[in-house]
Regions:
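N-terminal [4Fe-4S]-dependent radical SAM core
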Residues: 1-24, 31-43, 60-61, 223-226
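Conserved beta-strand termini and adjacent loop/short-helix elements that scaffold enzyme active sites
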Residues: 7, 189-191, 227-229
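A secondary-structure boundary/capping signal
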Residues: 24, 71-72
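Short, charged/polar surface micro-motifs in flexible loops or helix N-caps
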Residues: 28-31, 87
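Conserved alpha-helical substructure of the radical SAM core
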Residues: 38-68
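Flexible, glycine- and charge-enriched loops at secondary-structure boundaries
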Residues: 47-51, 134-138, 204-211
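Conserved AdoMet/S-adenosylmethionine-binding subsite of the radical SAM
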Residues: 55-60, 64-67, 76-203
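Short acidic, glycine/proline-enriched helix-loop-strand junctions
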Residues: 195-229
Length: 229
């Protein structure tokens, strides 16, 4: 049974262009300092929502929502995710997924069930452990990215930018690398202090240069590119 740490009944931002409910899956193997859902990191949460209650809610929303996004945490950590997606799809909803690619093989298993993926690329490959606190996380993430690109599933590739963690040079390096790998839809988004448990990151989030200026230099690399500041 899927472990659910939270549920947003309606969102117009978690899946661009869609009205969706968001199911927050409990558990994540990474420890990103800027995480705005730190309560979802442990494998078990203090206030989990029974999966049957989530399904009951979704039945009441049939015909009112376009889709359901499985977010986290890291949804692909849970081996029950494919069955949960099938149950939601059987109710007539489209399926979205937020993931960092921590489990490439699990990701590959659910891609045939998914209509759209929001995939987080956190750093240049070699610098991943500095962000995630996990050795080998970069290799896992980029293996997951390649599976998404090969699948043909609609997606956007997103990078959260905090000036203490990623320099403009890092962002530019990442953009060129992603374009070379075949990424066509890219977003860079500013760090959000809400929910972040790292006081140092919250205090030192000011940028010397607006993120939009960095973004203007990268627009031509992708079919679609945007900055969420």
């Amino acid at each position: 049974m899927l472990r659910v740490g939270g549920l947003t009944p309606l969102s117009a931002t978690d899946w661009p262009g869609m009205l969706a409910a968001v199911v927050f899956c409990q558990g994540c193997p990474w420890r990103c300092g800027y995480c705005h859902n730190p309560d979802l990191i442990p494998a078990r949460g203090d206030s989990e929502i029974p999966w049957d209650e989530v399904l009951a809610f979704l039945r009441r929303r049939q015909g009112m929502l376009d889709g359901v996004v499985f977010s986290g945490g890291e949804p692909t950590l849970q081996t029950s995710l494919p069955d949960a997606m099938r149950e939601v799809r059987a109710l007539g909803f489209k399926i979205g997924l937020h993931t960092g690619g921590a489990y490439p093989q699990h990701l590959a298993a659910v891609l045939p069930l998914v209509d759209w993926v929001g995939f987080d690329v956190k750093a240049p490959l070699a610098d991943y452990p500095r962000i995630t606190g996990a050795a080998g996380s970069g290799e896992r993430a980029f293996a997951g990215l390649q599976k998404i690109l090969a699948s043909g599933v609609a997606h956007e590739i997103r990078t959260t930018v905090h000036p203490a963690l990623l320099s403009d040079a890092d962002v530019e390096e990442m953009a060129h690398d992603l374009a070379a790998r075949g990424v066509q839809h890219s977003v860079i988004q500013a760090f959000r202090s809400q929910g972040c448990g790292d006081e140092t990151l919250r205090r030192n989030a000011a940028r010397d240069r607006p993120l939009q200026e960095t973004g203007r230099e990268l627009t031509g690399l992708f079919e679609t590119f945007s900055v969420r500041a």
